[in-house]
From Swiss-Prot:
The lineage of its organism: Eukaryota, Metazoa, Chordata, Craniata, Vertebrata. Component of the prc2/eed-ezh2 complex. Residues 215-250, 319-376, 651-700 are annotated as: Disordered. This is Polycomb protein suz12. Polycomb group (PcG) protein. Component of the prc2/eed-ezh2 complex, which methylates 'Lys-9' (H3K9me) and 'Lys-27' (H3K27me) of histone H3, leading to transcriptional repression of the affected target gene. Residues 218-228, 664-674 have a biased composition (Polar residues). It comes from Xenopus tropicalis (Western clawed frog).
């Protein structure tokens, strides 16, 4: 009743109440839209991050090559025409030729250095133009680090001077001829491997000396009277200090490796800028002068070092007698490695000698011509493609139209629309891609594949390995044995765009994964460690008898001193027999004895060990391991084997050995057939170590 009374009030008071009642109704709609948008972003974010990671991983350690796929055959630019004439011996000849060319290039080539200038912009310019210094003295030394001998504390170093040049100081970067710059050549004889066992590495040592300039007051450039200490130094000490080093001179040094200890060339053709380091003011002992690099403790950023100096710029070339060709590859800056396809007028201009530019153009012309030929031979398919992302059957986002055929997730250039759609469907199966025709190109609808099996289908061994194992793989590795069940493999149909159209409602099962890998992981029962793929065929609980264990057992039995030789032989055969078949229970001994007679019966008869074997059976009976029935069966079986051996010997043709030696088998058999009344005597003889007595009766 109260709401009705409140509703009968005046009209002006009713409108604000209606507006107040509508505001809470709009807020849930905006929150729901934002929540749906967040769910949309989360649904597409996880697969996108996964495919971005897989892209980086495939670049480092690819699982397969895209050019080998059927729908990417246009990416394979190689022809198999040379396979018909291919021979394995050609590989060795090719490698030897390449190795010989590299050695000849590295040794026979002369090292030519052309110095552009020495740049040092920290000092303030002098007011007197007459005393302005325009050059510095550069000394180039070839440092040879030799192998250390036993008596040497450190590796001996040999310094070979190659020459001195006057290098311009802070020259203006204007185009100039190469002849205007000082150049220096290092002969190839210095790098000859005549004493290669002595020299370990070769380095170039640059030593720049900048002489001090003095004005009319006798002060060096950049100094004033304020810099002089109040307490003047005595003339004698000042004279003594000036004798060690010229006052005002500055020395800058730098070192670069030419050949390392493995005789690999480290300096290629190109333009270099080396950061120099100033040596501290310290007295040098002329009797034992050695070159040292002493840091001043001031760490400058790299850009500040090369912008202010001191730096030395030079051009390095490996040349032969012909000055127009180079024998070593060119070390180009990083910024120009991918700029070969740009026109010449669009390339940034820089101060380079004409010879260096000619060499770079000659080396890169073949590669550039081949790239242009490959690109021009294939007509480019210009299509405007845009992607439309769907979530809950509603369009959430649409990308801008692109005129290329690159995959948005792995940036692979598919070059054809059919190849792009096939790649998206097979390599990015976490999404569903539907092709929609467009007059100017194509539209691809992207939605989440709800039927995708996101369980781990890779190698289960990788889960238990350390992080980063996938990137540290060096070559092929053995994987778990796998069996794929092919549900259906029909005849390959002709490529058609209709297979990428939107599927019907009854074809949802086609998005499901039909076959999966062997993702089971087994563990050792004794150590609980994962079973590796190479251990799948071997049972860890199976007690085998390796060769080393058999030899160890025989050696230990030979060391026994309280048994005779016959007992040792029976013990060896019995222990190896038990190890091979793995008898571990008492109820297995009856079967083990019969199996032992079948396997080792001929050896027992041949070595005349029948009585020793009888004692072994009696000993096992004393420990309740076998029964009397087993002893009777074993003895009967042994007699059958003995009679068979005798029959074979009678049928065999007589030999010289048969006349020289008596029939041992007959003697042993007659002795074995003695009555049980003599068993005690036999036992006493065997224990005492005496050989068994043979019967004098011989069979006719």
């Amino acid at each position: 009743m109260a709401p009705q009374k409140h509703g009968g009030s005046s009209a002006p008071s009713g409108k604000p109440s209606a507006a107040a009642s509508l505001l809470p109704v709009r807020k849930p709609k905006m929150e729901q839209i934002q929540a749906d948008h967040e769910l949309f972003l989360q649904a597409f974010e996880k697969p996108t991050q996964i495919y971005r990671f897989l892209r980086t991983r495939n670049l480092i350690a690819p699982i397969f090559l895209h050019r080998t796929l059927t729908y990417m055959s246009h990416r394979n630019s190689r022809s198999n025409a040379k396979r018909k004439t291919f021979k394995v011996n050609d590989l060795l000849l090719k490698v030897e030729k390449m190795k010989g060319d590299q050695e000849s290039h590295s040794v026979s080539a002369h090292l030519q250095l052309t110095f552009t200038g020495f740049f040092h912009k920290i000092d303030k310019p002098s007011q007197n133009s007459e005393n302005e210094q325009s050059s510095v003295t550069l000394e180039v030394l070839l440092v040879k680090v030799c192998h250390k001998k036993r008596k040497d504390v450190s590796c001996p170093i040999r310094q070979v001077p190659t020459g001195k040049k006057q290098v311009p100081l802070n020259p203006e970067l204007n185009p100039a001829k190469p002849s205007t710059f000082p150049s220096l050549a290092v002969s190839s004889n210095e790098f000859e491997p005549s004493n290669s066992h002595m020299v370990k590495s070769y380095s170039l040592l640059f030593r720049v000396t900048r002489q001090g300039r003095r004005d009319f007051n006798g002060l060096t450039n950049g100094e004033t009277n304020e810099n002089i200490d109040v307490s003047e130094e005595p003339p004698a000490r000042r004279k003594r200090n000036s004798s060690n080093r010229d006052e005002g001179d500055k020395t800058f040094v730098a070192q670069m490796t030419v050949f390392d200890k493995n005789r690999r060339l480290q300096l290629l053709d190109g333009e270099y800028e080396v950061a120099m380091q100033e040596m501290e003011d310290c007295p040098v002992n002329k009797k034992r002068a050695t070159w040292e690099t002493i840091l001043d403790g001031k760490r400058l950023p790299p850009f500040e070092t090369f912008s202010q100096g001191p730096t030395l710029q030079f051009t390095l070339r490996w040349t032969n007698d012909t000055p127009d060709k180079s024998t070593a590859p060119i070390a180009k800056p990083l910024a120009t490695r991918n700029s070969e396809s740009l026109p010449q007028e669009h390339k940034p201009s820089s101060v380079k000698p004409a010879q260096t530019v000619a060499v770079k153009e000659s080396l890169s012309s073949d590669l550039q011509a081949r790239k242009e030929r490959d690109v021009s031979s294939e007509p480019r398919q210009k299509l405007r493609i845009f992607y439309q992302f769907l979530y809950n059957n509603n369009t959430r986002q649409q990308t801008e139209a692109r005129d290329d055929l690159h995959c948005p997730w792995c940036t692979l250039n598919c070059r054809k629309l059919y190849s792009l759609l096939k790649h998206l469907k097979l390599c990015h199966s976490r999404f569903i891609f539907n092709y929609v025709y467009h007059p100017k190109g194509a539209r691809i609808d992207v939605s989440i594949n709800e039927c995708y099996d996101g369980s781990y289908a890779g190698n289960p061994q990788d889960i238990h390995r350390q992080p980063g194992f996938a990137f540290s793989r060096n070559g092929p590795v053995k994987r778990t044995p796998i069996t794929h069940i092919l549900v259906c493999r029909p005849k390959r149909t002709k490529a058609s765009m209709s297979e990428f159209l939107e599927s019907e409602d009854g074809e949802v099962e086609q998005q499901r994964t039909y076959s999966s890998g062997h993702n089971r992981l087994y563990f050792h029962s004794d150590t609980c460690l994962p079973l590796r793929p190479q251990e799948m065929d071997v049972d860890s609980e199976d007690e085998k008898d390796p060769e080393w264990l058999r030899e160890k057992t025989i050696t230990q039995i030979e060391e026994f001193s309280d048994v005779n030789e016959g007992e040792k032989e029976v013990m060896k055969m019995w222990n190896l027999h038990v190890m091979k078949h793995g008898f571990i229970a008492d109820n297995q001994m009856n079967h083990g004895c019969m199996l032992f007679v079948d396997n080792y019966g001929p050896q027992i008869i041949q070595k005349n060990l029948c009585r020793n074997f009888m004692l072994h059976l009696v000993s096992m009976h004393d420990f309740n391991l076998i029964s009397i029935t087993t002893i009777d069966k074993a003895v009967s079986r042994l007699r059958e084997i003995q009679q068979k051996v005798e029959r074979d010997e009678c049928l065999a043709p007589p030999s010289d050995e048969a006349f020289e030696e008596p029939n041992r088998t007959t003697s042993s058999s007659s002795s074995f057939m003695e009555t049980n009344g003599k068993d005690r005597v036999v036992e006493n003889d065997c224990v005492s170590g005496q050989p068994p007595k043979h019967s004098k009766k011989q069979k006719p």
